[in-house]
Every structure is written in C-alpha cells, then in structure tokens.
Regions:
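Structural signal for hydrophobic packing residues in well-ordered secondary-structure cores
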Residues: 17, 21, 36-39, 43, ...
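Conserved C-terminal structural/oligomerization subdomain of aldehyde/semialdehyde dehydrogenase
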Residues: 220, 271, 317-459
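Residue-level signal for inorganic ion chemistry
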Residues: 28, 73, 134, 165, ...
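Short, well-ordered beta-strand elements within core beta-sheets of diverse protein domains
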Residues: 15-21, 112, 219-221, 251-256, ...
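N-terminal Rossmann-like NAD(P)+-binding subdomain of aldehyde/semialdehyde dehydrogenases
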Residues: 1-101
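Residues at or immediately preceding the N-termini of alpha-helices
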Residues: 3-6, 25, 43, 227, ...
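ALDH superfamily catalytic-core signature
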Residues: 160, 193-327, 390, 458
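Rossmann-like NAD(P) dinucleotide-binding subdomain of oxidoreductase/dehydrogenase enzymes
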Residues: 93-229
Length: 459
C-alpha cells in the first residue's frame, strides 16, 4: 500500500468513526459476532498458516492463538453492554443538585501493530478490545509471518469494510508511512527498539500508546520448591513456540543447594515433553527466520551446554538447550534470548535475587517456584515486573479478568478483558446540573459570608 493510499484509508476511517456508526452497542456486538464466526470458519487455514510461519502444531495453534482469540471475543460479547454503560459517581455537596457520571467513549481511529511470534492472537485479541470499545482500526501484522498475515487479510476483509477495519501488509516502508499518520490511539506489540520508534512518532501527534514489549523475565527456584513440578512447568513455558514467547522464562535463577537436582529434572522433562530427537518432533516448532536462528546460536556457549545445543538450519530448528555455570556477564545474559536456550544461574539468598533483578531493566514477567509463602510475597512485592506466576509460568496472560502488560522497559499499558476495553476507551467526566436552582455564591462580586459557605462545602 502506498503512502497516499494509507493517508486515504485513515481519512476514510476517521469519517466513518465521526458518523457515529461504531457507537451503538448493538453495532459493536454485531462486529464481534462477525469476527468470531469468520475465525471459526477459517480455522483450518489459520492452522496451516501458523504451521508454515512457525511450525506450530494444530494443538498449539488452537491453545495459544485461535482459542485465546475466540475466548477474548466471547468475553467481550458477554460484557460489552455493561462496560459501555455510563458510570454514575458520587456528587459532592458543593455540586448540589447535579448528577455526575463517567461516559465511556472510544478514542476513534486506532492503529494495531502486531509481531510475528503469535501473529494471530496478538493481532486479533487487541482488535476485539478495540471493537468492543467502539473504535475503528487499521491493523498492521508483521512481515515476518506472511502466511498468517494473508489469512488475517482474508478474514478481516470478509468481516468489515475498510473504513471500519483494514489490514495493511508490508514491511518497514509501510510501518513508516503508518506512523506518520495521526491516529487517535496506537497499540504496539514488539521489540523495545521499535517500541521507542513508535513512541517517538506518536509524540508528534500526542497520541496515547500501549507498548507491549519484552525483556529478560527471570524464573526463581528456591530451596523449598517442588523441583520435579518446577522443572515440568518451566520446560513448558520456556520451550513453547521454540522459546519465542514474550513472557517465556528467559533465565532460571536457582538456589545453589538445588541446582543440580533441578538440572536433572529439566533434562528429564525435555526428553519427556519433546522426545529424544526434538528436531524431528511434529509438536516442536521452528525459529521464525534465518536471521533469528543465527542470533540465537550466537548466544550458546558450547562449553556450558548441559543439554541440547544441536540445530538444523534446513528446518530452522534448535534443540531445547540448557546452559549451566552461567554468569551475568555471559553473552546469553546481555539480551532477551527469545529462543529455546535456558541459562541457569545460582543464588544464595532471596535478597541477593531481588537486588540483582531490580538492578536490571524491568522484565515483562517474573516467576517464582517456592513453598514459602513469605518468600513468594516478598519477591512479587519487591521486584518490578509486568505480571507473573507463583509456582507456574506464562499462564497469567490467559486470564481475561486480569490485565496483561509491561512495566518500565517492558512496556506500558495493558489489555485483555475489562482492562482491554478500558485501554481503548476515554472516560469523559460529565456533570449534569439542574436548572431550577443556581447558588449565587460563586459569582462575583463576592459578598461577606460567601467564603464561610465555600469553607463549609470545601473541606
């Protein structure tokens, strides 16, 4: 799409939004139903596209992508009528004879920029929230997942006219053109580097943004943890989608006394979940492209590998890999791994862990495996992070009743469920004043006794 075509598209969407067509709750629900039905009817195509782009199995495609989108749409279909109501609030005595309320109002024309690692879910979940809130949307999927982008284009073109929801495909040139336009809200999921560019561009128009970024999410395992269960759940969260998950445990921070036991259990769980030859497993995905394949291999120190380490360039697969005796100065600890490599570091005290984590950029997630409730409370209270789990990994993002988002360097804003509706909503504060009485004390010239009345009301 050319720069002029993008300009025209944004203009058409703004005109459509200003017509009021997206405001009725009935229109929002109809849009969500169309989207739900289209996804259901195209499920086989979605599965094939995700298999081609990322090697995802059918089960994983539904569990982590299609099913999560359908669940989010279902949640919005159920709750949007309630969310969209005016919210009555208390009126202070100084505003005598008034009715005060907050009016949920859509921002207008929104831009949703999604990544390649969960290209279906991370496009359509925020879109469902935006539509429920009454916005129009321009959707820009990643160029790195072309098969899924093509399916998204077909599904959304089938459901919506472009003045309501439109898909812009392409790469950096299209991204640049889009970010020059004046949107009313921008929702971006991706890397920190690109997130900064999005925020700089948004600042030109003072456009509010949600940035869902990433970071090095720690997974703490203390000496009281159920090591066998911890290993099972860590392996699941770490190697899901070949480690290409923004909330995957980036590294394991293990108490020195249980490290060897944890490594043995992790090795067992990798064999149990992915088999003796994971490079040939139909359930194990692949790295998105050769550039990322080479980047991940460059982080592996062969001398520190205690499991895995093998790869197949022809299929872009890297074995689930575990590294021991890792320090914070190793290459694997200098950037977000975003791949199937698990470094294991050791600690001697929880205070040491908290100091170290807080000395680093705020991660998107934090996980702690422990039987000590005080330790869990201390870690989750004292460390800065977006969200997380106690005695599990990654599942916190699958709960519509909780918002999901980053903190500090891992992003800003959140979505899912009511939080997602609120993200795409501006709450107008309105006072509806009665006309049959008008207290004179606020008007000049001020008279003796007016200040006493003001002091009575305002204290």
């Amino acid at each position: 799409m050319t720069e002029q075509e993008i300009k025209d598209l944004v203009t058409r969407q703004r005109s459509y939004f200003q017509s009021g067509a997206t405001l009725p709750v009935s229109a929002r629900l109809a849009a969500l139903r169309r989207l739900y039905n289209a996804i259901s009817s195209h499920e086989k195509e979605i599965r094939r596209a995700l298999q081609k782009d990322l090697g995802k199995s059918g089960f994983e495609s539904y569990m982590c992508e299609t099913g999560m989108v359908l669940e989010e749409i279902s949640y919005m279909l159920k709750h949007t009528p309630k969310f969209a109501r005016e919210q009555r609030v208390h009126t202070p005595l100084a505003q005598f004879c008034s009715r005060s309320y907050k009016k949920p109002s859509p921002y207008g024309v929104t831009l949703i920029m999604s990544p390649w690692n969960y290209p279906f879910m991370l496009t359509l979940s925020p879109l469902a929230d935006a539509l429920a809130a009454g916005n129009t949307a321009v959707v820009k999927p990643s160029a790195y997942s072309p098969y899924t982008s093509e399916v998204l284009l077909r599904i959304l073109a089938e459901c919506f006219e472009p003045q309501y929801v439109a898909v812009v495909t392409g790469g950096r040139a299209e991204n640049t053109c889009l970010l020059r336009e004046h949107f009313d809200y921008i929702f971006f999921t991706g890397s920190q580097a690109v997130g900064k560019e999005v925020m700089r561009s948004a600042a030109e128009h003072l456009t509010p943004v949600t940035l869902e970024l990433g970071g090095k999410s720690p997974c703490i395992v203390d000496q009281t943890a159920d090591i066998r269960l911890a290993a099972r759940r860590i392996v699941f969260g770490k190697y899901l989608n070949c480690g290409q998950t923004c909330v995957a445990p980036d590294y394991v921070y293990c108490h020195r006394s249980v490290k060897d036991q944890l490594i043995k259990e992790v090795q067992k769980q990798i064999r149990r979940q992915y088999g003796k030859q994971p490079l040939h497993s139909s359930d194990y995905g692949k790295i998105i492209n050769e550039k990322h394949f080479d980047r991940i291999l460059g982080l592996i120190d062969e001398k520190k590998v205690v499991h895995g380490g093998g790869s197949d360039r022809s299929t872009l697969r890297i074995e689930p890999t575990v590294m021991d005796n890792v320090t914070f100065s190793d290459a694997v600890m200098q950037e977000e791994i975003f791949g199937p490599v698990m470094p294991i570091l050791v600690f001697d005290s929880l205070d040491e862990v908290i100091r170290r984590i807080n000395s680093m950029p705020h991660p998107l997630a934090l996980y702690i495996f422990t039987s000590d409730k005080k330790a869990a409370r201390k870690a989750t209270a004292r460390c800065g992070f977006g969200g997380g789990c106690i005695n599990d990994t990654i599942i916190h993002l699958a709960t519509s009743e909780m918002g999901f988002g980053g903190f500090g360097e891992s992003g800003m804003g959140a979505y899912h469920g009511k939080t997602g509706f609120d993200t795409f909503t501006h709450y107008k504060s309105i006072v509806d004043k009665k006309t049959w009485i008008d207290l004179p004390m606020r008007y000049q010239p001020y008279r003796k006794g007016d200040e006493k009345l003001v002091r009575f009301f305002l204290k």
